[in-house]
């Protein structure tokens, strides 16, 4: 009988290398928020991948960056804390970009960990094969990696192969979660992240990091209908106007797109009500950050 493997795997990397895309690809559901804007992942998102012979819990950390405010400090603390008490680390980089100072900063952190570190070069669909080997050799000159695997999370290229390689390094163990559980976050958290994703897609560069979403109420009104009320927090009146849009058009579009994804997540019809409120300088208010769901692990 084949042994059952289980383990916790941390995904770390600079902003926008495709960590959330990878998590959503291997889980088969949208759990982690995806956007082309940096720093969109704020909490550790645990995606649970269950196969017949293994269960892998992926922890998608906020992208490593230099903090600019209290929320940034929190995001960095989460990323670093995630490196402890796990079975493997995926260091994800863009195959189509030069090695940057952010990558070097992460490599210096990783040199001190005893956990197996896998270098995963993402976005190989954007790179000519001849360019791949020199990039791999360049990374190898910085440190010894347990394994190096090129993938495309968006296209699904080589992802299954990477999972097979990863499994060989994980310990034997039981299933930590039921077969049908794909995340350890409550549904309300995932719903809030879906709403935030739609705002990021529809608004300009001024808005992204000033957006916080809190799901105030989520009630199953009948077997096939869920009523959700959520508040979108911004820092300035001008941002409130951008999110709402002329005649409320932008907010309606956010609601329409979010409702579609939430209905797929919950398997029910959804009645979604959204409000936009100004909470000045909220990213520097620790208590407010906690109030809207960004909570550090307690030691």
UniProtKB/Swiss-Prot annotation:
Region (G2): 39-43
A biological process from GO: ribosomal small subunit assembly
Keyword Aminoacyl-tRNA synthetase: no
Keywords, ordered alphabetically: Cell membrane, Cytoplasm, GTP-binding, Membrane, Nucleotide-binding, Ribosome biogenesis, RNA-binding, rRNA-binding
Any one GO cellular component localisation term in the record: plasma membrane
Residues covered by the KH type-2 domain: 203-280
Chain segments carrying region G4: 122-125
Membrane topology: Peripheral membrane protein
Residue ranges, annotated region (G1): 13-20
Residue segments, region G3: 60-63
Domain Era-type G stretches: 5-172
Positions of region (G5): 151-153
Localization (cell): Cytoplasm; Cell membrane
GO MF annotations in UniProt: GTP binding; GTPase activity; ribosomal small subunit binding; small ribosomal subunit rRNA binding
Main localization category: cytoplasm
InterPro entries, sorted: G_ERA_dom (IPR030388), GTP-bd (IPR006073), GTPase_Era-like (IPR005662), KH_dom-like_a/b (IPR015946), KH_dom_type_2 (IPR004044), KH_sf_prok-type (IPR009019), P-loop_NTPase (IPR027417), Small_GTP-bd (IPR005225)
Residues engaged in binding GTP: 13-20, 60-64, 122-125
Family annotation (CDD domains): Era, KH-II_Era
Description of how the protein assembles with itself and partners: Monomer.
NCBIfam families xrefs: era, PRK00089.1, small_GTP
General function of this protein: An essential GTPase that binds both GDP and GTP, with rapid nucleotide exchange. Plays a role in 16S rRNA processing and 30S ribosomal subunit biogenesis and possibly also in cell cycle regulation and energy metabolism.
Family designation: Belongs to the TRAFAC class TrmE-Era-EngA-EngB-Septin-like GTPase superfamily. Era GTPase family.
Protein name per the record: GTPase Era
UniProt source species: Staphylococcus aureus (strain JH9)
